């Protein structure tokens, strides 16, 4: 082979980048499994490459390259990843307490069950399986990652059932094919049909065995049904017995179609020698079976000697095979209208063509049938014909099935059933539930639907031997039996707690993990979804069908009406064990308990105030928003709350004495016996005795007894001056300062009124004076009685004050002569270290100097003791931290020269 040079990697780069393929590159040849290339030409220039890129690529330039091992490598990597820590797994599957790590995308692709769960809740990280064992699930998880099963033969049915439950389609197909192949191989190994029958019979439980044919049944009820329907005649030969035995392991087949498969037919020499006799016997048996089928389908029958004619009703245990019975009937019975048979004269059916099917209608009672055999059996109800006779007591019946039931009374081997089933409408006793159902449908048709619904809900097919509770399905009974054991197989996915039932686990999760559940309409929260649903139905929707017979009020629930009637009766059954207060409703009692426990769970976002109830918070928020949505139709006045509007309308416009309906509650102070209307007012008052000041300023650490006082105090630390004077340009931080300015500077309010107001406040303030303060108290009282200029008593009082105490001063009006134009000098005996003199400031031009002096001449500085509760208004006190306090108080400009009143000397 001629050696050729290989092309460099430029060729590959050209293919990847999409270069134009020239003829020189097509010289590549495959020789002996190796790809070789001829010498490539020189690399094209950039201009040529750009022209080639502008040309549209042709389809033959593209190549399909695939890796056969990539899929397997991907699954292998994912399988290895889930078995190591840490991993990229994002799902935890818990089966019988054992945890399996998996990838969501893998289980969602392979299982429709997981796909539905993860699609519904994409954020789910934990899934718990209750109906699958951990060993079986381990096989299925291995299959999802490796597409292979490595199981024992006996495990195949269990894995198949779990695969159907999890809806793993590929696993179901694979296991079904394996199961069928194994079953066919097992059948081919058998030498004869008898061995096959023996093998299949051995698989059945040996707990219940038929004494006639030695058949085995798993349940006693199946044996009873077998005895009642099979051994009505013992004249059938070996073939019939073989056919009846084969019936026991046929799955979901019709009870009316019991043909034996061809492979199981008995072809022994004895039957072959019988010749025509065997054929006659076979023909007789076939006719007898057909007659039995027709008889069993008769809707009218008698079940006792009293000649009560009943209609047939399919029992609960036959409900599973009802559809298959119809299919088999279509194969064996002639369709309606094919043959009239031996129908009595005058009872010829009326044929009705309905949807490509003929229906037979009885001319006597207008009942319809789709099979001629059923109609023939029905005609015996009208003719009175009873062709089936008991060979023991010669009692005759119109159908073979009723004769079979009757023969159970004469059988010694079968336990005789007493008439323990009582009709709820006529109190008649019946031997079985089936005959009772026929009786109700025949003689109480108006109550038939009610009886059937009760029968389905209270079926005794599966009954617990411990508590005698009945269930309609076997899995329900099996799950119920867990309650009588110590097992707790149901684990909570959020915690480590286990439960005996799924319902108990669900209630636990709703109460402790999934709540609270808020109402979208009113915002109220509930611990579980049941209470939320009940709240929505009762509060926000539904009809008010319960009406109070006293006041006519309508409510949605009966329990609500019962609680409403307590208003008229005065009953209050809910008693608080802490304070002894009684309540009419349980909800009011539970809300009251929050008061004792200080459970204020609803907080205002604006001011931080907390409330016990959500509706209280909603009403409080209207204070911040200023919303007044409730307007009076008479006067147009608006209110923030509806109850306030109601009280206003009744009291103002209707003239009702609304407040007389409510008993006033008063709270008395235990110390001073003072009475307050509100409990909060009493609490604030009691702080005057205890000295408690719970509200502290975070800036200056000053404490206050009332929160409102702290709020006003905080304005001092800010630069905001929100209160403006309407008469001048003066601004104030507090509203009371603005009021004082208007009253005293602009003279809108007379000094006498202001003085009287000050006197009232001074006398109303609760004060406690020490022995040192009694002198000042007497002087104050004397001044209020006869306002005049203070004499030297004030100076004498000031001499007793400690030098280390800063003496507060206040402005007191005095009588000055009109001719005097200079201020009377006053000096104090305070040390200079307490307050320093402010530096001189330029005089303001907004107010004339003469006006300033004339205004100041009306006041003098009167010192007061420092260790008393100030008997004057707070706005009258000078703040040493604010040099322009006096100017602000009088409405002067901040630049006006104001001398500090706490100087080292007080000139007199």
UniProtKB/Swiss-Prot annotation:
Annotated stretches, region: Disordered: 38-59, 252-344
Matching Gene3D superfamilies: Classic Zinc Finger, Potassium Channel Kv1.1, Chain A
Biased composition (Acidic residues): 267-276, 297-336
Any single Gene Ontology cellular-component annotation: nucleus
Function: May be involved in transcriptional regulation.
This protein's encoding gene: Zbtb41
Top-rank lineage group of the source organism: Eukaryota
Name of the protein: Zinc finger and BTB domain-containing protein 41
Alphabetized SUPFAM superfamilies for the sequence: beta-beta-alpha zinc fingers, POZ domain
């Amino acid at each position: 082979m001629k050696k050729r040079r290989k092309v460099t990697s430029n060729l590959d780069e050209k293919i990847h980048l999409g270069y134009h393929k020239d003829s020189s590159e097509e010289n590549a040849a495959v020789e002996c499994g190796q790809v070789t290339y001829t010498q490539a030409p020189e690399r094209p220039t950039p201009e040529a490459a750009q022209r080639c890129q502008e040309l549209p690529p042709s389809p033959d330039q593209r190549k399909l390259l695939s890796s056969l091992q990539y899929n397997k490598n991907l699954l292998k990597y994912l399988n290895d990843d889930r078995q190591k820590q840490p991993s990229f797994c994002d799902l935890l599957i818990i089966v019988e307490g054992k945890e399996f790590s998996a990838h969501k995308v893998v289980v969602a692709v392979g299982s429709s069950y997981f796909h539905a769960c993860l699609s519904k809740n994409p954020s789910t990280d934990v899934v718990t399986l209750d109906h699958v064992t951990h060993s079986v699930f381990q096989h299925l998880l291995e299959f999802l990652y490796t597409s292979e099963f490595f199981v024992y033969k006996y495990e195949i049915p269990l894995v198949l059932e779990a695969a159907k439950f999890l809806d793993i389609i590929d696993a179901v197909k694979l296991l079904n094919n394996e199961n069928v192949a194994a079953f066919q191989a097992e059948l081919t190994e058998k030498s004869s049909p008898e061995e096959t029958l023996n093998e299949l019979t051995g698989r059945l439980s040996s707990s219940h065995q038929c004494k006639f044919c030695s058949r085995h049944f798993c349940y006693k009820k199946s044996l009873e049904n077998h005895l009642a329907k099979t051994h009505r005649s013992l004249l059938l030969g070996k073939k019939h017995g073989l056919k009846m035995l084969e019936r026991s392991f046929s799955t979901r087949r019709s009870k009316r179609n019991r043909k034996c498969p061809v492979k199981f037919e008995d072809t022994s020499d004895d039957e072959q020698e019988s010749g025509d006799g065997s054929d006659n016997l076979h023909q007789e048996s076939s006719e007898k079976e057909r007659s039995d089928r027709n008889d069993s389908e008769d809707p009218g029958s008698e079940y006792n000697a009293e000649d009560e004619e009943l209609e047939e009703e399919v029992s609960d245990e036959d409900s599973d095979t009802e559809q298959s019975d119809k299919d088999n009937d279509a194969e064996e019975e002639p369709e309606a209208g094919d043959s009239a048979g031996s129908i009595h004269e005058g009872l010829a059916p009326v044929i009705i063509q309905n949807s490509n099917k003929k229906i037979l209608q009885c001319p006597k009672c207008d009942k319809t049938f789709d099979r001629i055999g059923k109609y023939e059996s029905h005609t015996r109800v009208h003719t009175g014909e009873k062709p089936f006779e008991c060979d023991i007591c010669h009692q005759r019946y119109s159908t073979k099935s009723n004769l079979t039931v009757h023969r159970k009374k004469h059988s010694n081997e079968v336990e005789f059933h007493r008439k323990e089933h009582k009709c709820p409408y006529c109190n008649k006793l019946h031997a079985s539930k089936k005959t009772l159902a026929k009786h109700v449908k025949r003689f109480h048709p108006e109550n038939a639907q009610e009886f059937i619904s009760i029968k389905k809900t209270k079926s005794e097919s599966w009954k617990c031997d411990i508590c005698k509770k009945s269930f309609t399905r076997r899995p329900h009974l099996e799950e119920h039996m867990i309650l009588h054991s110590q097992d707790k197989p149901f684990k909570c996915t959020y915690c480590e707690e286990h439960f005996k039932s799924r319902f108990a686990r669900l209630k636990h999760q709703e109460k402790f993990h999934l709540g609270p559940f808020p109402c979208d309409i009113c915002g109220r929260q509930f611990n579980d979804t049941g209470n939320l649903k009940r709240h929505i139905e009762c509060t926000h929707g539904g009809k008010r069908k319960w009406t109070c017979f006293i006041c006519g009020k309508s409510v949605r629930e009966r329990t609500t009406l019962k609680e409403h009637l307590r208003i008229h009766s005065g009953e209050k059954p809910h008693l608080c064990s802490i304070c002894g207060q009684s309540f009419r409703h349980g909800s009011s009692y539970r809300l009251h308990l929050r008061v004792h426990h200080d459970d204020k769970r609803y907080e205002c976002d604006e001011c931080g105030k907390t409330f016990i109830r959500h509706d209280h918070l909603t009403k409080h928020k209207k204070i911040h928003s200023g919303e007044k949505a409730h307007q009076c139709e008479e006067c147009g006045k608006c209110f923030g709350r509806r109850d306030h509007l109601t009280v206003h309308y009744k009291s103002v416009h209707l003239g009702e004495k609304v407040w007389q309906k409510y008993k006033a509650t008063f709270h008395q102070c235990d110390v001073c016996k003072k009475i307050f209307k509100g409990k909060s007012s009493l609490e604030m008052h009691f702080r005057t005795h205890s000295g408690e000041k719970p509200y502290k300023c975070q800036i200056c650490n000053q404490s206050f007894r009332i929160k409102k006082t702290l709020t006003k105090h905080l304005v001092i630390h800010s630069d905001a001056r929100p209160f403006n004077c309407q008469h001048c340009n003066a601004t104030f931080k507090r509203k009371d300062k603005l009021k004082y300015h208007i009253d005293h500077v602009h003279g809108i309010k007379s000094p006498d009124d202001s003085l009287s107001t000050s006197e009232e406040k001074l006398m109303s303030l609760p004060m406690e004076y020490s022995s040192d303060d009694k002198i000042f108290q007497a002087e104050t009282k004397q001044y209020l009685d006869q306002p005049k200029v203070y004499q030297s008593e004030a100076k004498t009082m000031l001499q007793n004050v400690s030098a280390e105490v800063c003496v507060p001063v206040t402005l007191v009006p005095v009588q000055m002569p009109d001719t005097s134009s200079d201020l009377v000098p006053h000096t104090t005996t305070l040390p200079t270290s307490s307050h320093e003199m402010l530096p001189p400031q330029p005089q303001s031009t907004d107010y004339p100097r003469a006006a300033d002096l004339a205004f100041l001449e009306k006041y003098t500085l009167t010192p007061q003791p420092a260790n008393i509760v100030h008997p004057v208004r707070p706005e009258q006190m000078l703040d040493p931290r604010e040099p322009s306090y006096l100017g602000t108080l009088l409405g002067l400009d901040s630049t006006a020269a104001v001398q500090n009143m706490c100087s080292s000397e007080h000139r007199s």
